[in-house]
Amino acid sequence: MATATLPDAGTASRCQATPTVTVHDNRLLAVRVIRYHRTDDEAADERIERHSFSHTGFPLDSSDARLADSGQSANFRYQCSLSGRALATASQDAGASQILFDIEGASVWNRDALGNSQRFAHDPLHRLSSVSDNGVSSEQLVYGETAVVAGANRRGQLLQHDDPAGRVSTPAYALAGLLLTEQRQFLGDDGKTLETTVYTSRYHYDALGTLRQLTDAVGNRRRQTLNVAGQLAARDLQWAGSNDWLPLLQSIDYDAAGQVRHEVAGNGVVSDYDYEPQTRRLGTLNTTRPGKPLQALSYQYDPVGNLLGCSDGTVSRRFRRNQAVDGNQTCQYDALYQLVQATGREQAGQQTEALPAPLPIDDTDLSAYTRTYDYDRGGNLSAIHHQGNQPYTLAMVVSSTSNRTLQQSDGLTPADVDAGFDAAGQLLALAAGQPLGWDSRGQLQTVTLVRHDDGSSDQENYRYDGHGQRSQKTLTTRTSGTTRSQRVRYLPGLELRDTTQTPDGGSASTVETLQLLQLDGSGRLSVRALHWTLGQPADIANDGLRYSLADPVGSSLLELDAAAAVVSWEAYYPYGGTAAWAARSDSEVSYKFVRYSGKERDASGLYAYGLRYYAPWLGRWINPDPGGTIDGLNLFRMVSNNPLTLRDPDGLKGGKGYLFMPIVSPDIMDMAIAENTQRLLVNKAPFDVLLYDRDNRRKLHSLLGDFRKGASDSAFEQQIVREMGFNQYNTDVELNRKMGKGAAIKRFTSAPKYIRLATSQMSTKDITTSQILSQLKENDKLHILAHGAAGKPFVLDELNNFMSMQDLAFSLYKHDMPDLPLRILLKSCHTADPVNISNAQPEVKIGGPAALAAAQSLRDELRKLDYRRVQVVGYHGAGERYGFLDDPEAHHTRKIGGIHGILARSQKVVFSCATPSTAGGATFIRR
């Protein structure tokens, strides 16, 4: 077995005596977070993050150490409603914004720092019906109340959505509400009228509601085969007009923990994964084709999971300019786990937004490099010092009043930086002569690449759908009297890429039409398929397959063709720039669009992450985090400045989460399934499930087996819908009213499918053998699943088997849970209630009962074991297992007013181990 975790004396020395300390007031509110930073052997720098709260306990402002110590305004200032929701937010990074909610908790109006406003209208069932931007209608939604077509199952479903990209129609659903047909029409160039072409995608499911086949908009079909455990077993592709299936993934095997162990790609390439037994971290990855190794990767980590290095045994050591150049990459971190040094190999030239020219496949003209990184006290990357073929320093200038940052040029000072951003914190230009244009929703709309003497410009333009995802991209360039336009239309599993040319004074003609299929593989494997209907390059075969092998953060390292020959390879700097790449032909490599972190690289050099854009040569985002403070008070920082260990899948970032079942029973298993169903419904990866020991793990797998048998029954959908809906709501009308918030009706009807997925994808670990608790990091969350009662110091199952908070705390301690700023979320009923207040009015003050809330009891037991940085989160009221269908981002929902009451997000109460128990205080329950 692989041994991947190594002692790292350098990191240990830098982290010595650098705790994170949270200070609470007498209301148990965190008013200070103190961190200690050290890069070398110097004295630790104390950094204090400050938070203040109103007399009702709601946030007023938050400041990081840099702005607070320099006397600047707080990073964030809030004005909250009486129920505690932030109605006005003033951010130094993102500007001032306001938002209003209706009585159901849905947003009805918002305004950003530029004065752009949105209004949201709802129908009588409280489903989103229209959106207007700055007073102009931008979205319309139509539901199937009257448009009844036999066999189409359209009643109550979303039928048509007119959005900023055009129109999406969904004319047919399965009986259980699964989408069968989706049609997209794009807006024309005038931005007002629809194109006549309708692109239709079709979905096919098995009896369990699992997607088995997708037919894309041009008729290509891809299918997947599952094993008896519901895990992916194979994938195939059938080109439109063909009867033959091409294997993309021939076979795949898993270990007992559900991790990929062995896979065979469609081109015969074999990948073998080996994991460290104690941590389940990937230790080695060997990839071979018949007769030749392609990759022999070994990974090393420090004890907390930071990547220390990666070596590739297939790369021979060579010497250039008296320096060894090999396949080894190393990393070092400071006391806050920010990357401070990295080594690797590169080709000649300074990193810019442009790609270097590709080398021949067998070229050995590479040099070793070392990069060191400097950060300021607010977590901003302030300098990159590069030692290599061409030494240089890339300096950044950070605003004195915010975290906005520009690359140093022409004597730029901190006072000048804010002029490079608009009031909402959106970058105004990539460089001189390259302005950026933003739409009213804060989405990048235009990038000007070059301005010509005749007044024309080379530009890239973008359009987005109603969910904020990119639907079209158009690159327009002008050379030698000819305008060339390259347009990409994004469809489910398919990109349509068309190129037209227009000579001055002439008419446009299409010179290339490419269908690019994005096909999922497994593990580190992904596949692209290229089909030309016009303009096929002479040196590239049509209907070609490209197999891409990725690194731990998803970056494409090695690209192979259908015969397993190398098409290209690429190496990256830690923050995403291309350090070196090689290709067997310039023509082939021009069709490589997905690179760093598995994201598409645009002509500007920016990477499109879905919710925002990333500039790899700057190591930061070009606009503030739409998720707010999910990754801290710095809204521009990339993955906590730890880009080799952490990955941001969509432009947001947060800690890891785990589900922990202290007791195993059918009811608690259902809770775990519901938790992961919620995550799948909002396109998040399911959490791993932690159990005490192997016996509990075997018991859970036995229960899961019984559940899967029941899930194969034809009545499963109706049973689940009945349990989720009619047991929770009293009438059809109330169900539709409560579940009809925008896309919530789709969440409800598609839940059975995701329940099956949550069951089949459930990965379990026992804390005795995996040592997973010892690997928890700052900001990680441990969700405790069980039943509970107000004022009771224990958790239990439906048969009244119970575990005391003392035993629960000791078990976490016994299995080496670290004393870090992580959160334990008690998901039982009434975990913040010292008495049963489930029928209380929306806002009630509770004062000093003798009993302690369950979360408070667990906090006290952890304190007895010398935990001081862990936080325990409790929730008011009796939890609703499927309440997330009403509020998909809520950790805990409850009913106020009994069985006929209102379903609302529970207010959480945080009990910090830094503060001893108190018998008084005030708790406010929020609707």
Language model segments and positions:
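Thioester-forming pentapeptide GCGEQ
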Residues: 1-49, 54-55, 175-178, 184, ...
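Carboxylate/His-rich catalytic cores and anion/metal-binding grooves
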Residues: 24, 32, 46-64, 170-173, ...
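Acidic/glycine-rich beta-solenoid
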Residues: 40, 68-76, 86, 93-94, ...
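A motif-centric feature for acidic-aromatic and gly/ser/thr-rich catalytic loops and repeats
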Residues: 537-610
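Short turn/helix-capping motifs enriched in Asx and small/polar residues
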Residues: 564-581, 590, 605-606, 611-612, ...
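Glycine-rich short-loop/terminal segments
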Residues: 654-810, 915, 922-927
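Catalytic cores of nucleophile-dependent amide-cleaving enzymes
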Residues: 772, 778-884
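Caspase-like cysteine protease fold
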Residues: 870-927
